[in-house]
Amino acid sequence: MNIGGGKFLLGRISNNPTSGIVGLANVGKSTFFQAITNSKLGNPANYPFATIDAECAKVNIPSVPLSNLLRIYQSAKCVPGTLTIYDIAGLTRGASQGHGLGNKFLNDIRHVEGIFQVVRGFLKEDITHIEGNVDPVRDLSVVQDELILKDLEFLENIRERLSKKMRMVSKNSKEHQEMKIETELLDALEEHLFNGKKIRHFKDHWNLDEVKILNKHNFLTSKPTLILLNVSPQDYVRNENKFVRNIIEWINEFSPGDKFLLFSAEFESQLMECKGIASEYFDKIKEDTNVSDQQLVSAIPQIILEMRKLLNLISFFTCGPQEVHQWNIREGTTAQEAAGVIHSDLRETFISADVIKYDDLKKMEPPLNESLLKSKGLIKRAGKQYIMQDNDIALFKAAGGKIKK
């Protein structure tokens, strides 16, 4: 997708975005899954491969504009945008060769659009570590190496198929030239992978031909990644951990562009279980760390919003007396394409859209006075090629007098 300035976005991101939770066994993936989805799905247990089949659940994307627009429009209900989360089986060394649940693990990753990579940063003797000791940098390297090895295998298979096809068509044909360009890109990516680097970080800006090639093949290391260091509740509320510096150094060298956050699966689990911080458990944390109630907050909203940003997602809203609806779209989406997210017919019959900027509305008091907005020139007519902006409010108009609110 072209987001302007000749920049094209890498990745096959849908309007119903998905992310998978990955990492070694026993690092807190399933506990994190339960916390982020506010459910009892998943199987957090103190042994490897407690999760076999990937669980999934939808989570709401936090949105201040959504609740504010509900108030301004006095709508009967609101429908938030969502992100589908998968709890994927734990990885082990040799996964790319099929060891453990390797083939299933890697196949599950191929079907998601973003990756939450959980690494263990807490010390607890009663919770075993599959590698024998806690070392998040080693764990990051193990997972990345397995993804790279699988991509190298996949890349070689693609190149062999291309080589056979190229011998069957004229060297002067357009098809041959396209396959030659693809082969040259794959050769460059292979060298990059051999250096222990992800495809996603091969370059900062991709051209349209490169994006088409990479999105077609859906390489594992082309997916955006949010690294989550699972620490003790005490480290989390103090926002410190002895492994942080080494992790940041590793990211800068081997995975630049990946984002990194601290969280505590135990803290989030207790927060969900106790339905707040009014409990002896959190009183003990405050006593141990000398922090205030204001510091005992969940990391989940920030984690979801960070993944939203990594997936290059924005939102637009349709508003009316029945509902305020938040819709996921990707940066660079046109007004006509956004209409198609609501219904494919609306894209085909699109005429125009009336667009209001959220910033022009957010301080207004209900009930909304659309006549006042029009008199101030705050309702803009947008054509097919208008590029939607984050938090736009849109009323789409279609042929045949059909209007979708």
From Swiss-Prot:
<dbReference type="InterPro" id="IPR027417">
    <property type="entry name" value="P-loop_NTPase"/>
</dbReference>
<protein>
    <recommendedName>
        <fullName>Obg-like ATPase homolog</fullName>
    </recommendedName>
</protein>
<dbReference type="InterPro" id="IPR023192">
    <property type="entry name" value="TGS-like_dom_sf"/>
</dbReference>
<dbReference type="InterPro" id="IPR004396">
    <property type="entry name" value="ATPase_YchF/OLA1"/>
</dbReference>
<dbReference type="InterPro" id="IPR012676">
    <property type="entry name" value="TGS-like"/>
</dbReference>
<keyword id="KW-0342">GTP-binding</keyword>
<dbReference type="GO" id="GO:0005525">
    <property type="term" value="F:GTP binding"/>
</dbReference>
<dbReference type="InterPro" id="IPR006073">
    <property type="entry name" value="GTP-bd"/>
</dbReference>
<dbReference type="InterPro" id="IPR031167">
    <property type="entry name" value="G_OBG"/>
</dbReference>
<dbReference type="GO" id="GO:0005739">
    <property type="term" value="C:mitochondrion"/>
</dbReference>
<dbReference type="Pfam" id="PF01926">
    <property type="entry name" value="MMR_HSR1"/>
</dbReference>
<feature type="domain" description="TGS">
    <location>
        <begin position="312"/>
        <end position="398"/>
    </location>
</feature>
<feature type="domain" description="OBG-type G">
    <location>
        <begin position="17"/>
        <end position="283"/>
    </location>
</feature>
<dbReference type="GO" id="GO:0005524">
    <property type="term" value="F:ATP binding"/>
</dbReference>
<keyword id="KW-0496">Mitochondrion</keyword>
<keyword id="KW-0067">ATP-binding</keyword>
<feature type="binding site">
    <location>
        <begin position="26"/>
        <end position="31"/>
    </location>
    <ligand>
        <name>ATP</name>
    </ligand>
</feature>
<keyword id="KW-0547">Nucleotide-binding</keyword>
<comment type="function">
    <text>Hydrolyzes ATP, and can also hydrolyze GTP with lower efficiency. Has lower affinity for GTP.</text>
</comment>
<dbReference type="GO" id="GO:0016887">
    <property type="term" value="F:ATP hydrolysis activity"/>
</dbReference>
<feature type="binding site">
    <location>
        <position position="231"/>
    </location>
    <ligand>
        <name>ATP</name>
    </ligand>
</feature>
<dbReference type="Pfam" id="PF06071">
    <property type="entry name" value="YchF-GTPase_C"/>
</dbReference>
<comment type="similarity">
    <text>Belongs to the TRAFAC class OBG-HflX-like GTPase superfamily. OBG GTPase family.</text>
</comment>
<dbReference type="InterPro" id="IPR012675">
    <property type="entry name" value="Beta-grasp_dom_sf"/>
</dbReference>
<dbReference type="InterPro" id="IPR013029">
    <property type="entry name" value="YchF_C"/>
</dbReference>
<dbReference type="GO" id="GO:0005737">
    <property type="term" value="C:cytoplasm"/>
</dbReference>
<dbReference type="InterPro" id="IPR004095">
    <property type="entry name" value="TGS"/>
</dbReference>
<dbReference type="InterPro" id="IPR041706">
    <property type="entry name" value="YchF_N"/>
</dbReference>
